[in-house]
Amino acid sequence: MFLIIFILPTTLAVIGDFNCTNSFINDYNKTIPRISEDVVDVSLGLGTYYVLNRVYLNTTLLFTGYFPKSGANFRDLALKGSKYLSTLWYKPPFLSDFNNGIFSKVKNTKLYVNNTLYSEFSTIVIGSVFVNTSYTIVVQPHNGILEITACQYTMCEYPHTVCKSKGSIRNESWHIDSSEPLCLFKKNFTYNVSADWLYFHFYQERGVFYAYYADVGMPTTFLFSLYLGTILSHYYVMPLTCKAISSNTDNETLEYWVTPLSRRQYLLNFDEHGVITNAVDCSSSFLSEIQCKTQSFAPNTGVYDLSGFTVKPVATVYRRIPNLPDCDIDNWLNNVSVPSPLNWERRIFSNCNFNLSTLLRLVHVDSFSCNNLDKSKIFGSCFNSITVDKFAIPNRRRDDLQLGSSGFLQSSNYKIDISSSSCQLYYSLPLVNVTINNFNPSSWNRRYGFGSFNVSSYDVVYSDHCFSVNSDFCPCADPSVVNSCVKSKPLSAICPAGTKYRHCDLDTTLYVNNWCRCSCLPDPISTYSPNTCPQKKVVVGIGEHCPGLGINEEKCGTQLNHSSCSCSPDAFLGWSFDSCISNNRCNIFSNFIFNGINSGTTCSNDLLYSNTEVSTGVCVNYDLYGITGQGIFKEVSAAYYNNWQNLLYDSNGNIIGFKDFLTNKTYTILPCYSGRVSAAFYQNSSSPALLYRNLKCSYVLNNISFISQPFYFDSYLGCVLNAVNLTSYSVSSCDLRMGSGFCIDYALPSSRRKRRGISSPYRFVTFEPFNVSFVNDSVETVGGLFEIQIPTNFTIAGHEEFIQTSSPKVTIDCSAFVCSNYAACHDLLSEYGTFCDNINSILNEVNDLLDITQLQVANALMQGVTLSSNLNTNLHSDVDNIDFKSLLGCLGSQCGSSSRSLLEDLLFNKVKLSDVGFVEAYNNCTGGSEIRDLLCVQSFNGIKVLPPILSETQISGYTTAATVAAMFPPWSAAAGVPFSLNVQYRINGLGVTMDVLNKNQKLIANAFNKALLSIQNGFTATNSALAKIQSVVNANAQALNSLLQQLFNKFGAISSSLQEILSRLDNLEAQVQIDRLINGRLTALNAYVSQQLSDITLIKAGASRAIEKVNECVKSQSPRINFCGNGNHILSLVQNAPYGLLFIHFSYKPTSFKTVLVSPGLCLSGDRGIAPKQGYFIKQNDSWMFTGSSYYYPEPISDKNVVFMNSCSVNFTKAPFIYLNNSIPNLSDFEAEFSLWFKNHTSIAPNLTFNSHINATFLDLYYEMNVIQESIKSLNSSFINLKEIGTYEMYVKWPWYIWLLIVILFIIFLMILFFICCCTGCGSACFSKCHNCCDEYGGHNDFVIKASHDD
């Protein structure tokens, strides 16, 4: 239970809730705690502790910690009894607020029994509600042993301890627990039983409890520290009952002196042994503040400015709107109807009061934590309104509610705003009183037939995916479109008017015509085409419900064409459910969003006070509807408040006005005085004299905190305290100068009391540092005689001076500079408010100042000044005629242009040819000359070829040749030859190209067939792999079930480990790192802007100085020495320079001097004085002469070089010395401060309640493997067998005239052969051998000439 986190009011605190005993209890003893006569004296280290148990040697240290107030009183809380206990001992003032902590001074009562020394003193208890739901710290002595425990005790209602030395009539009884209580800390420490006093220092800071202890010496040493994470609110000292202890015997009395601690700054002094020998509470007195400012226990004499004693509010103005109703938040939280995360509910509470303590007590709280808000600050605060959201928690999705989580609950149901000031409440309701309201808030879901979720009574519905649609969305297809579908025909129906039907197209495949292809297939969660699906996945925003669940459009509509569109219940996708029941209670989440902190009338009345009167004219503390501060109320007449407004703010968000609802009066709120207080301190005195500058003593006495002083009065400078008014008395020397000719004079008390009987050693007197002296009776010096040097010789010198008057203007994109394009950084940067706007505003002001400065300089230069140019000096050289073109590179539109322009691309067509090896050679041959067409005929495998593409010029040429050949045969027949060759060669080119394409087709077919074989093998391997995966996964699932059973008993340890991991891997770590980077960059940017402001100040000062020098040096001759150059000014020139002006000064500079005696004036006859005019009176050879101040030239004194005076007196006024504070701020130890902050950074651990019904599901991949096997068979049946294209071999035949010539030649050959055979002797011999073959020649008729043509 986290109720104990909050500080409970004193009136609600009780000691324990278990009545251990009722015997011998009464309410007769009305003792109240004694108040000590001694006060806290920290000068010897009382109340201090050694800082983090560290050692410091021979040093003085300023340290801020939890200390008692110097001069505070102690209260004795020791209670002693014998037989009876009083009920009043367990109520205030004995039951006290712990607040920051306490310092205890405990008497060690020593009793001797049977020659044995016993140590007795009371036990102290520190806790909050003192029951077993919170931790209680108990420090109990056991005769030399300190037993210190921090446990969840069940404290008795009337607890007490008994005397160990002599026994007691009663039995010790201070807690009772049925079992051993849960303890965070349990340890024993020893202490010195012989010590007279024991000192304890207990305090808490940011959830950590610290304990310090000492039994020798008064500074305490570190004992232990313990992180509780809660606030300890109360403490009390348990009564000690004993037979022997008597209040009448000093050595047997009990004393337990306690004083509260507060966060204060102390000055500590450590000696050479590291022991604290002296201490000062910096805010306890005026002297202590001076000691802390100087970090010295013996400050030097001087005047110091103080700040710690400026304001003392004398009253409190508290205002709340009366009679507001109760918000009744608890009634709404305990309502039996609980919504699901899908339809979470919201309620806004305003203009009412709520009691957070009561609220958390009336609901069964599991945890309560806050984000961007200290939950302890809710008590007593007011808000504009409180927004409360709630819903039941599905058990398996509890982790989704962690801040920054992206689980289903926050991505698709309810988004927690981590940037708002909010608190998260986890609570539960009894099972019998809960009704889960599972409702779909989506209107477009309900339009198309969404009914109920059909889940059990305690199941909570939540969305896994959210979808948004346009207002004209309809999930049904158009009947007129899908009626023509042959395959994959979807359901259809009539959509409502104004909506669009589901998009469906008729498509044609290789085997099926009119195949329907519709959108959002197979469903909107896993659609193939998310861009065309009208259902878009979305993430819920802050304050938004899920727009709608997904709809499987395949299940929307009917087979009837004229029915209205509706969807079946199983068409709605993307939702889940789980039970909210745990331990017979339903777990519920509620988010409190606090709007307008300290700016409204929705107030917590946990610490409610009564409305008070408005005190005017004095400094008061105020609490106006939760807004706190200090100020002075002054009644005014104001008509600018509306009836719903009651506070007036300035542009910086500070409250400056107030309208009282009770009296209808209006007030302006002025700040309390926080001005300058000067303390005049004389070394080794006991206190300083004070000067409240510009304040009347009447205001000081009513509003300013100070030690009562009998001496105060109003002076010209302000109210003076602890000094005597003696302004009629003057002194010539003063160590404590207050300014304006006044001084604080100090005299030792002993001598002053004898002469005047004045108790204060300080006097407020007039300061007159000099008296007039005379040299002789006739002519006397006025103001003294001095020795100076006057120039006697000069030389002309030149001097160059540059003054910057402007600079380049700077503008910065602050957001881009810090974050670039990182969205998370931009989101976090927005929380820094108007920082970036202020940066740009400052830079704009800087730029405006630059403009104004430039204008002022220009105006000064335009009036009677000629700018000099081309001045060659020893500091400058001409920079004319420098050529920068080589640095600029290529400029203009011609850079990077190619030989082909865009115009050429538009005017000419580009033709790309498939080249099998001769087109490139042809182009290289022609070189762009089309007339070389036939000259560049290429040979490809022995065949003459040309590219099959002709340009317009080539077509015209060949056509003309063919036409001429046909018109004038036979003379022009030769003109047709080029045309014929051109056609034939290009046909050859097409032929060889087709041959290559045929070969490529074969290669493609072979490669594709090989790919199909590879795919087939791959699917086969995949099927085998899936089979293996199935066996391995099932084996792992079996092992996982066994492992979960083994981890069941040890799950608590795992949860603890996860908590430790979460503490290191917190979701906020990324934001912390981003915030560090932003802080670093903002610091750099702020430093840069600060430098810009500093620079513009210098530039503005430089511009003013430049204008002054233009007016005094350039336009005229300056009488000032070393202002226009070095020496006496002669002439100055000015020239423009980058970002400024260059001055060239000419002056004459002294080279030699003469030492003379001079006097500021002379007194003649003792009653009339003269003073020199633009020179000096010098004493030369016992006579007085006059000389100029810039050149030694003595001349007689005359009425032309003197000024006459009525008297010879001199009035002296001297400015006071102001001592600047040169002390270096003392920062606390970095590691200690870091540990204090870091240990409070905690994370909410996820709910890791073990579900014993977890079962690892075995995978069944049989169906998937069958599908893959079928795919393999289908691929096998789709093997491509490309038909090979036949190749035709063409033989080129000879022309007909060649064949005719061959026949003629053959006949001639036969005739010659016949002649030889028949007409010569050789032929007769042959005939004889042929056996009359010639005779048979003409009768043979079977000779056949066979010709074979394969074509």
From Swiss-Prot:
The chain crosses the membrane at residues 1296-1316. It is a single-pass type I membrane protein. Residues 1245-1284 are annotated as: Heptad repeat 2. Residues 325-605 form the BetaCoV S1-CTD domain. It is found in: Virion membrane; Host endoplasmic reticulum-Golgi intermediate compartment membrane; Host cell membrane. Residues 13-1295 are extracellular. The keyword Membrane applies. Gene3D superfamilies: 1.20.5.300, 3.30.70.1840, Spike glycoprotein, N-terminal domain (2.60.120.960). GO terms for biological process: endocytosis involved in viral entry into host cell; fusion of virus membrane with host endosome membrane; fusion of virus membrane with host plasma membrane; receptor-mediated virion attachment to host cell. PROSITE patterns: BCOV_S1_CTD, BCOV_S1_NTD, COV_S2_HR1, COV_S2_HR2. This is Spike glycoprotein. It comes from Human coronavirus HKU1 (isolate N2). The lineage of its organism: Viruses, Riboviria, Orthornavirae, Pisuviricota, Pisoniviricetes.
